[in-house]
Amino acid sequence: MDRELNEHVMIERVEMIARLTAEGTCQERDREIALNLIAEIARGNLMKNNNFSVVFSAPPVGETFAKEGKVKVNITLDKDQKIGQPVIDAFQCELTKRIQSVFPSTRVTVKKGSMTGVELMGFDKDSDREALDSILQEVWEDESWR
């Protein structure tokens, strides 16, 4: 089970690096990491006699990446909670930093409104939404940014 979970995590990382490479924002070190992960996954699958293939395909020139500019996290905090603007700004700053470390092209907005709410746009995979939920919870519970 651990090996399968590790493979799943490695595959997600490889997919993320492939996406960044296709967008042109990937560093050479990231490519090396991806190739090493692919080799490790392939080696493990060869030992189990599974068929395995990896295909990378960059979008054609002139075609924008599907999520580019459309990936957004909008958070509304209830104005009745009496949260000061400096706290809201610090929350947005920390949230942006942590989310963009995983989803680089994401735009994060935090504002006051009539009720608390979270809107996620452009995140099609459930695993992406779960990762965002986890980041949101971690940042909100972490006192260090306040």
Curated annotation (Swiss-Prot):
Effect noted on mutating residue 40 to K: In TUM14; loss of prophage induction
Pfam families to which the protein is assigned, alphabetical: DinI
A GO biological-process term: SOS response
Functional description taken from the UniProt entry: The TUM protein is responsible for UV induction of the 186 prophage. The other three proteins modulate TUM activity.
Membership in a protein family: Belongs to the dinI family.
Name this protein carries in UniProt: SOS operon TUM protein
Gene: TUM
